[in-house]
Curated annotation (Swiss-Prot):
Cited function: Transcriptional regulator that has an essential role in the organogenesis of lungs, pelvis, and hindlimbs.
Keyword vocabulary terms for this entry: Developmental protein, DNA-binding, Nucleus, Phosphoprotein, Transcription, Transcription regulation
Gene designation per UniProt: TBX4
GO molecular function, one term: DNA-binding transcription factor activity, RNA polymerase II-specific
Modified-residue entries (Phosphoserine), positions: 516
InterPro entries for the chain: p53-like_TF_DNA-bd_sf, T-box_DNA-bd, T-box_sf, TF_T-box, TF_T-box_CS
Localisation per UniProt entry: Nucleus
Annotated segments matching region Disordered: 1-34, 488-509
Ranges of compositional bias, category Basic and acidic residues: 1-14, 491-509
Main location, first listed in the record: nucleus
GO biological process: angiogenesis; cell fate specification; embryonic hindlimb morphogenesis; embryonic lung development; limb morphogenesis; positive regulation of DNA-templated transcription; regulation of transcription by RNA polymerase II; skeletal system morphogenesis
Transcription regulation as UniProt keyword: yes
Protein name in the entry: T-box transcription factor TBX4
């Protein structure tokens, strides 16, 4: 409330040039008796002089002289004067924004010569230094025309006002919270300025009256002006020298430290182990590396050579630069046949061993003595096959390798003769309903032909007839056999006892279709552990079942 009152009254006193402050400073002697007379408690009786008009006049003159001497004896020194001189020599610029921006260097002063018990009010106003508008051209400021009409003058009263002289002289008086704005409708009390105009800050020290206020006609005050604090208001820095001075001296000037050429300097100041490479240097290195590289070398390799000795801020760029083209993530666009073979058959078979199939954990409890190789010897499920865009397009040239294997693959992966028949696995059940986690895709390149029903679902497995063309089935694969339903005794003979008991019902009829004639020419035995579902058929084909010539249940 005190500051509001002071602002309203001070605006009347400092409104126009030649205001009450200037008039009072010009005629201090004439106005001196009036505030002395208005001061309470200053009478002849109080001073101990005999009553009378002459005594009262003498006492009033002595009190006025003491008050005048107190105001005149106040000395003010500018803090960081050398820094202000550096800015002044280069042409000080101050940023103004709509929201308001603080000044740098901050306006700080050291005050001496005050009466320790008298209360004072300290305030600042910023007035135009001339009537010109400026522009920055050829690395110097030039007059561009006549100044725009001045904004309504505002005063910034120090938050500690009013305070005793002892308080002001105890430490530096800082006006660092003062903000400059170009918003003519600013409601926050910031100093309103016009851009590209020159201004001069002024410090006023006013003696507070009996109401701890100022602005009356007879108020005693003094004004201090430092020419090195003059500046030109700008919305962005024009002179690079001023920008450099702000960066070197302002610890809060973080907005300028992310530029291109200052990255290395800031890295050295912060003593980083790996310097941050600026964008301009990185761009030059990339261009020079690509120009010196061979025409058939991709820009990705050139970027890798330029970045191998440095640490870039974004780790993702380093990962892609260090990776080879075939190791990059798969794109969603179909690639050509020569460049789309990211995984061959052996890799897919090896990676299939480490798959964590949900059906294994859900329907089986694998005994610890049985190796993982019995469960994962087949191609991966169809949902993984459909994730790779290049897999379906390469089914025809790789179907012999994927489903049956040839030569080295049979002996290394699934051609072991001395292995016992595998225990119950996830795709040996004829009574389990299709799993919802498998999204099965019908492959037109491997058509199936209708085949009559060769067995029915009963409690025990009947004898199965041998399939024609036995010459296409190599010896030693009898362990790839059909398991419709095995009793608990059969499980004990072939492996450790499992605690799982099937509770599902058996379907009435299961049809099985023989492999395609396209596969008979290349396949040496039927593929195992895979599901296929035809959208036109209403039954499920369990293709993970092989055949045996002579089957006995006992």
């Amino acid at each position: 409330m005190l500051q509001d009152k002071g602002l309203s009254e001070s605006e009347e006193a400092f409104r126009a040039p030649g205001s009450a402050l200037g008039e009072a400073s010009a005629s201090n002697a004439a106005n001196a008796p009036e505030p002395a007379l208005a001061a309470p408690g200053l009478s002849g009786a109080a001073l101990g002089s005999p009553p009378g008009p002459g005594a009262d006049a003498a006492a009033a003159a002595a009190a006025a002289a003491a008050a005048e001497q107190t105001i005149e004896n106040i000395k003010v020194g500018l803090h960081e004067k050398e820094l202000w001189k550096k800015f002044h020599e280069a042409g000080t610029e101050m940023i103004i924004t709509k929201a308001g921006r603080r000044m740098f260097p901050s306006y700080k002063v050291k005050v001496t010569g005050m009466n320790p018990k008298t209360k004072y009010i300290l305030l600042i106003d910023i007035v135009p230094a001339d009537d010109h508008r400026y522009k920055f051209c050829d690395n110097k400021w030039m007059v561009a025309g006549k100044a725009e009409p001045a904004m309504p003058g505002r005063l910034y009263v120090h938050p500690d006002s009013p305070a005793t002289g002892a308080h002001w002289m105890r430490q530096l008086v800082s006006f660092q919270k003062l903000k400059l704005t170009n918003n003519h409708l600013d409601p926050f009390g910031h100093i309103i300025l016009n851009s590209m105009h020159k201004y001069q800050p002024r410090l006023h020290i006013v003696k507070a009256d009996e109401n701890n206020a100022f602005g009356s006609k007879n108020t005693a005050f003094c004004t201090h002006v430092f020419p090195e604090t003059s500046f030109i208001s700008v919305t962005s820095y024009q002179n690079h020298k001023i920008t450099q001075l702000k960066i070197e001296n302002n610890p809060f000037a973080k907005g300028f430290r992310g530029s291109d050429d200052s990255d290395l300097r800031v890295a050295r100041l912060q003593s980083k182990e790996y310097p941050v490479i600026s964008k301009s240097i990185m761009r030059q290195r990339l261009v020079s590396t690509q120009l010196s590289a061979k025409p058939d070398v991709s820009p990705l390799h050139g970027a890798h050579q330029a970045l191998q000795h440095y640490q870039y801020e974004n780790g993702a760029h380093m990962q892609f630069a260090a990776a080879e083209p075939q190791d990059l993530p798969l794109n969603t666009f179909p690639a050509q046949r020569d460049s789309s073979l990211f995984y061959h058959c052996l890799k897919r078979r090896d990676s299939a061993r480490h798959l964590d199939l949900p059906c294994k954990r859900s329907y089986l409890e694998a005994p610890p003595a049985v190796g993982e190789d019995h469960y994962f010897r087949s191609p991966p499920p169809y949902d993984q096959q459909m994730l790779s865009p290049s897999y379906c397009s390469e089914v025809t040239p790789r179907e012999a390798c994927m489903y049956s294997g040839s030569g080295p693959e049979i002996t290394g992966v699934s051609g072991v003769d001395d292995l016992p028949p595998p225990p119950l696995s996830c795709n040996m059940w004829t009574s389990v309903s299709p799993y919802t986690s498998y999204s099965v895709q019908t492959m037109e390149t491997v058509p199936y032909q209708s085949f009559p029903t060769h067995f029915t679902a009963t409690t025990m497995m009947p004898r199965l007839p041998a399939i024609s063309a036995p010459s296409s089935q190599p010896p030693g694969n009898s362990h790839f056999s059909v398991y419709n339903q095995l009793s608990q005794s059969q499980v004990r003979e072939r492996g450790p006892t499992t605690s799982f008991q099937r509770e599902r019902g058996l379907p009435s009829v299961c049809e099985r279709k023989p492999p395609s004639p396209h596969l008979n020419a290349a396949n040496e035995f039927l593929y195992s552990q895979s599901f296929s579902l035809s959208r036109e058929a209403s039954l499920q084909y369990h293709s993970g079942m092989g055949t045996v010539e002579n089957w006995t249940d006992g």
